[in-house]
Amino acid sequence: MARGEDSSSVQVLYQLSWDGKLEHPHMIEVHYPPNQGGLRLRDVKKRLTTLRGHGINDSFSWSSKRNYKNEFIWNDLCDDDVIQPLRGSGEYVLRASELFDTFTNKPWEHPSKHSNERMQSSRTMSVDNVTLQQGLINVKLHSGALAREDDQPSGEKLCCSGRRSCINLEDCSSKGVAIDIPKNLQNLSVDQETIDVEKSDFCLSSSDNEVSPRLKTAADCITPVKDVGLVVMTRSTTVHGLHTPAPRSLTSPTEPPFSPGSAKRMWKKEIRKSLFRTSRNSSNVNPVLSGENAALDVDVPPITLSTQEDVSFWRDGRSKSASPSSLNELREVQNEKEKEAEQSTSQLIRLLWARWTGGSSKGKRTPQSTCEDPLPKSPEAKQMPRSRTKTPCKEIRSTNHIAGSLPVTCPSPAVDNKAHSSLDRQEIPPQEECKNRPSPMTLQSCEEITSPVTEIEQDVEIGDIKAIVEEQASNKFPEPEFQQNLRTEQIVLSVQIPDLHIDALDSPTSDTQGSPAEADIPKSATARVKTSNSLPRVKTTTSPKPLPPGFHKGTNDTKPVQIITPRRTPRTSIPLASPPPLVRTFNRVSVRSLSSIAAITLSPENDSAASNLSPENPIVKKRINFRERDEMPLIPGLTTLDWEKALQEAVTDCLPPPNFREILQECSTCGRTFKPDSLQVHMRGCHPPQYARAFSARASPHVVRSRAS
């Protein structure tokens, strides 16, 4: 330390802390008067103000480093505090930390400023509300006079709108609205397209007196208006200078599709769509003619057989606006034609039904069926009746999908009789009539049935047909020829349609002498259909002979057999024999018993794959001895479980096990202990230190030379 006569001087070391980060230390020399008893903080600040400016004193808080219980602490200081030097070294160390209340040094903001801003914003909002209300009032006032202005020229409209805008501006100024109006007002000239655009920017409501302006964007505000000298400065986005007159309510052809009392609004696109629809629907259309045309488009009942000429005549009569008397006459003519058509249709249906069924009370013929008979045609067999009794022949039934997809080339009469026995359109005759019924008709009657319908003479009466049917019913026909023909037909059917199911009767039950014939009772659809849509049943069987002796050795070339049976559940394949690893454990007797069991299971008498096994021949399953496999000892007399148990007990007791040498083995090279199996792996890479040193010398000779030098 250097001391003078008037003052003393010391070396002070200080650090500044900005945002929690310390700067590099600075060294200064401070002078202080000797009569004050030591260096004070005021003297240091005075020196710093001279060196670094006035702000450094107010921006930091100062503390000095001092000893405290064999440690160092920082002692906060004020201006009049004496700075104590460190013991031993006698140094003065100061640290300046940035103050937390730095906002107090900023210029003071008066709270009245915020209140002024709030007042100004409230005034702006009030001005906006007043402007918006005034604009709505003006629009409502002008909507009533819009109808009168449409008859005036465009120039007069603009003048009127200019005068109204001036009146509106005067009203706004009287209410305190801030409006900037230039002194030199020019005449306004606006194109008609601009007015239409301004009109379309408003949305129409249901009532004629309510028009609400649409919010405009910045792009919408740019309108092709020329020579506009009137500018209204407002804060509202809904009022743009001129108050555009509201469009008047739409007329009937362009009326929006909503009721007058609702509050629904339509925008510009919806209005254009409605205009397009209305103009398109109402263009050159006579409502009277359209109503007549709509009335003419009526579906004709399917039972009427009126031709195109009748329809055109009726349409021509309807299209001509005739008198009521002529209309009544036309209706009477049409009714007569309909009655005649119904009578002719009903008569034709009866004739066709009698020809179709051959006088039988049940069944109809299979469509698209043809039958070629080598026998000559006879006129007596043309309208042969169908038999109502059971026949001794075989009944052939086919499924619905086969009957619809495959054309039957030669069906027998029994097939037709049974296939169509469910249609009961007439009552079953009593049993006395069934006694006189003969056996089924021959193939000549079958050929007659397949004759075209156009051969029927419509002039024949029903009574004549019934008489012919009774005459034919009294005749009897030979049976042997019918049975032979039937057998040949069945062969043809079985070849062409393999999926047909044939049910053969054991003995004939009808046409016996002295026994009454039984009438057929119609059966349900489920009883008629014998086959289903599922796959056919396939069974594969194996011979019950025992397997060859070499099968258990894995040398058998036979493949496993799968059982395919129709089930509701998904099919699963059942192998005939077990996998080879399991079969090896069987003896020859067990293999033979297993093969006999599989043969019994797969026999055709048993439909299901599962069968009850006898207790004499049980199936033996192989069991793996896991304990014998896992407890194979690593070293003689000691298993894996033994040394794992010893290690676990040692860890629990925190003591080495007594037989530690027997469990873990020590490496002779490095002295580490390993399990017996791990020690062998370790010994492959463990080498003595001399070997490692020599290897490193050969690998890096320059290192050895540097050490030697």
Swiss-Prot record:
Family matches, as PROSITE patterns: ZF_C2HC_C3H
Cellular compartments per GO CC: plasma membrane
Any GO MF annotation of the entry: zinc ion binding
Topology with respect to the bilayer: Peripheral membrane protein
Pfam families xrefs: SOK (PF06136), zf-C2HC_2 (PF13913)
Extent of Polar residues compositional bias: 529-544
Zn finger limits (C2HC/C3H-type): 663-692
Gene Ontology terms describing biological process: cell division; plant organ morphogenesis; protein polymerization; regulation of cell division; specification of plant organ axis polarity
InterPro entries on file: SOK, SOK_DIX, Znf_C2HC_C3H
Superkingdom of source: Eukaryota
Positions of the UniProt region annotated as DIX-like oligomerization domain: 8-101
Cofactor(s) for this UniProt protein: Zn(2+)
Region listing for Disordered, in residue ranges: 242-266, 315-344, 358-393, 411-439, 506-560
Predominant localisation class: membrane
Amino acid composition bias (Basic and acidic residues), ranges on this chain: 329-342, 417-436
Keywords associated with the record: Cell cycle, Cell division, Cell membrane, Developmental protein, Membrane, Metal-binding, Zinc, Zinc-finger
Protein location: Cell membrane
Sequence positions that bind Zn(2+): C667, C670, H682, C686
Miscellaneous note of the record: 'Soseki' means cornerstone in Japanese.
Domain note: The DIX-like oligomerization domain is required for polymerization, edge localization and biological activity.
Subunit structure: Homodimer. Forms long polymer filaments with other SOKs proteins polymers crucial for polar localization and biological activity.
Recorded family membership: Belongs to the SOSEKI family.
Function: SOSEKI proteins locally interpret global polarity cues and can influence cell division orientation to coordinate cell polarization relative to body axes.
Protein name: Protein SOSEKI 3
